[in-house]
From Swiss-Prot:
Keywords: Aminotransferase, Transferase. It is an enzyme of class 2 (transferase). It comes from Francisella tularensis subsp. novicida (strain U112). It catalyses: N(6)-[(R)-S(8)-aminomethyldihydrolipoyl]-L-lysyl-[protein] + (6S)-5,6,7,8-tetrahydrofolate = N(6)-[(R)-dihydrolipoyl]-L-lysyl-[protein] + (6R)-5,10-methylene-5,6,7,8-tetrahydrofolate + NH4(+). GO terms for cellular component: cytosol; glycine cleavage complex. The glycine cleavage system catalyzes the degradation of glycine. This is Aminomethyltransferase. It comes from the Bacteria.
Length: 358
């Protein structure tokens, strides 16, 4: 099993370790709900070094990424980040990614842990006709510092000059400090930062954050936080067999430049013209019970929907889920232990900055 540079720190903190995409990762440090609530109210830190930063450099870096990705990196200013999907030729989602623009000739992409090898292979396969170099940065670690007090904590562990620059970062912007990259991004629905730094320096940084008020959080809390925020998890909410249209991600596909071609565009436009017969929704179970991935949602006209992610929401204290359902259907119910329980369909976003949206 693969280990991140912080593996020994997790063991020392009595973390419960699990296999996540071939990596030994902390699922929690004792209480998933406490870790979740701490991120909503204070500051939690996550080791996400199982994800991979890949640098795309060269005179045709922008041209290549405009072809590779469904969102348009030409819209990005330097030191800005963008969410988007990478599609195959059938418009199936290969991965969802954050792309960071350093300069016109240098971009950084962070890919999901389960797709590290396949994504890099896809980059290389499609880069052959472009003047670009693709460099997986395997000597970098990634730490997410998340929560309303994230900025206070991170300011305590850096110099005053750097603290001022970090505090001034806008959402989806970033800055390099030597080999460290600090981005105001995250996967929790809270303010926070993702810090990409050399593996040789990550333990000292992690320990400094803990000494200055942060609490560690595992992948369990990361999952319930992102679910409350309505953020997709690759492999659960979407995969290679689904297009952005079917998963509420059409907003991330940029069609504004009709002259730009990108992988999957033709198939995507055909699917868009044909229309999809499902919609992407949030699901709330008002009574006791738990929503889980794979559960069916039944409607009174006989049609069905399916939950792709589900859990108890520590913030809302009810069970919530993400699902795709028929566009026209009424009176949704789920079957839990032989009982039909009513669910409410809502917008697929439940919590923002600690506050309920439902």
């Amino acid at each position: 099993m693969l280990k991140t540079p912080l593996y020994e720190s997790h063991i020392a903190a009595n973390a419960k370790m699990v296999d996540f995409s071939g990596w030994s990762m902390p699922i929690n440090y004792g209480s998933q709900i406490q870790e979740h609530n701490n991120v909503r109210e204070d500051c939690g830190i996550f080791d996400v070094s199982h994800m991979l930063a890949v640098d795309i450099q060269g005179s045709e870096a922008e041209k290549f990424l405009r072809y590779l990705l469904a969102n348009d990196v030409a819209k990005l200013q330097e030191n800005k980040a963008q969410y988007g999907c990478m599609l195959n030729h059938d418009a199936g989602i290969v991965d969802d990614l954050i792309t960071y623009k350093v300069t016109d000739e240098h971009f950084r992409i962070v890919v999901n842990a389960g797709n590290r090898e396949s994504d890099v292979a896809w980059f290389n396969q499609n880069a052959q006709n472009f003047d670009v170099a693709i460099t997986p940065q395997t000597d970098l670690a990634i730490v997410a510092v998340q929560g309303p007090k994230a900025v206070d904590v991170i300011k305590r562990v850096v110099t005053k000059e750097i603290a001022a620059e970090i505090e001034a970062l806008l959402p989806f912007s970033f800055k390099f400090f030597s080999k460290w990259m600090v981005a105001r991004t995250g996967y929790t629905g809270e303010d926070g930062f993702e810090v990409i730094l050399p593996t040789t320096q990550v333990k000292k940084f992690w320990d400094s954050l803990l000494e200055n008020g942060a609490q560690p959080a595992g992948l369990g809390a990361r999952d319930t936080l992102r679910l409350e925020a309505g953020m997709h998890l690759y492999g659960a909410d979407m995969d290679i067999s689904t297009t952005p249209l079917e998963r509420g991600l059409g907003w991330s596909v940029d069609l504004s430049d009709e002259h730009r071609d990108f992988i999957g565009k033709k198939a995507y436009l055909a699917k868009k013209a044909q229309g999809v017969d499902t919609k992407w929704v949030g699901v709330v179970l008002k009574t006791k019970g738990v929503l889980r991935a794979g559960q069916e949602i039944d409607f009174d006209n006989g049609e069905k929907g399916y939950i792709t992610s589900g859990s108890f929401s520590p913030t809302l204290k009810v069970a919530i889920g993400l699902a795709y359902v028929p566009k026209q259907a009424d009176n949704p119910v789920v079957n839990i232990r032989g009982k039909e329980l009513e669910v409410e369909l809502v917008k697929p976003k439940f919590v923002k900055n600690g506050k309920s949206l439902i």
